């Protein structure tokens, strides 16, 4: 990898999703993408994005030294910090328990007993569930082999699980597409969202540059504008639009899904 210097290439690994990276109508978009693009511009570097299909793949890409930065809505953890350098937090989230409206609504941790819980592969929610299971062995969960929160929301929407744990930001964005999936309650803890730096002797230097950028982004309003653009108007999204989209997914997607999946894995 090139060093983070003007004229060089910044390589970022991320995952697909509305809060991270996706292909919009005309160009790439996503909250994390907007930030790393601004970072590349601030450093006068070109940007190359690598998309991982699982959270494990995100960190494997860093471990192999194939990316400078992982910007994928990653929550900070002691386990991850032992392996990689991390930046300061740029977004605070909360873990939320979600369920399908009209079904049983848990209202507290105690209500999770004997429910079928699903989480995203590689997410830090497994750590929290392990702690809960120490207090209550009846707490059980399954891991979905995906890095996309939409797959978790879809599982709840189709009735394939009782509840799921998601980060609050991802849930807010995805609820627009899955209006029948609702928040049951929040876990009373704050999740610090950070970038992780690649496995490289220069990672400490890269961390300083990234932190300088994030500090400036907080001061000059860049971060606030990105938050407003991706999270600010979610609560006002049209439910009719959401149901219309869901109907199109049910009726039109099956015809094209095999081809889409084939191309995605090529």
Give the location of each predicted region:
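Extended ligand-binding regions for polar small-molecule ligands
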Residues: 1-2, 30-42, 101-126, 170, ...
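Extracytoplasmic small-molecule ligand-binding "clamshell" domains
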Residues: 1-74, 78-82, 142-146, 156, ...
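Short beta-strand->loop
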Residues: 14, 23-28, 115-122, 246-250
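Periplasmic-binding protein-like
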Residues: 15-16, 88-102, 150, 175-212, ...
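A ligand-binding cleft/hinge motif common to bilobed small-molecule-binding domains
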Residues: 56, 60-63, 71-83, 128-132, ...
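Pocket-lining segment of extracytoplasmic ligand-binding domains
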Residues: 96-177
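Export/targeting segments at the very N-terminus of extracytoplasmic proteins
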Residues: 234-266
């Amino acid at each position: 990898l090139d060093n983070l210097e003007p004229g060089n290439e910044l390589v970022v690994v991320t995952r697909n999703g509305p809060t991270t990276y996706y292909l919009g109508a005309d160009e790439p978009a996503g909250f994390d993408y907007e930030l790393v693009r601004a970072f590349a511009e601030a450093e006068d570097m070109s940007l190359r994005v690598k998309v991982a299909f699982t959270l494990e793949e995100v960190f494997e890409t860093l471990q192999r030294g194939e990316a400078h930065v992982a910007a994928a809505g990653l929550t900070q953890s002691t386990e991850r910090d032992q392996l990689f350098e991390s930046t300061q937090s740029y977004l605070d989230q909360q873990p939320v328990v979600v369920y399908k409206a009209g079904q049983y609504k848990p209202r507290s941790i105690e209500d999770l007993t004997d429910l079928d819980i699903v989480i995203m592969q590689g997410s830090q929610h497994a750590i929290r569930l392990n702690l809960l299971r120490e207090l209550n062995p009846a707490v059980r969960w399954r891991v979905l082999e995906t890095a996309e929160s939409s797959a978790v929301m879809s599982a709840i929407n189709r009735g394939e699980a009782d509840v799921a744990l998601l980060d609050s930001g991802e849930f807010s964005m995805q609820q627009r597409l899955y209006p029948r999936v609702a928040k049951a309650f929040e876990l009373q803890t704050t999740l610090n969202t950070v970038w992780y730096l690649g496995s490289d002797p220069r990672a400490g230097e890269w961390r300083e540059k990234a932190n300088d950028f994030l500090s400036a982004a907080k001061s000059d309003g860049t971060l606030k504008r990105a938050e407003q653009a991706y999270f600010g108007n979610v609560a006002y999204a049209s439910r009719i639009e959401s149901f219309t989209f869901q109907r199109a997914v049910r009726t039109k997607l099956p015809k094209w899904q095999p081809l889409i999946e084939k191309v995605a894995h090529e």
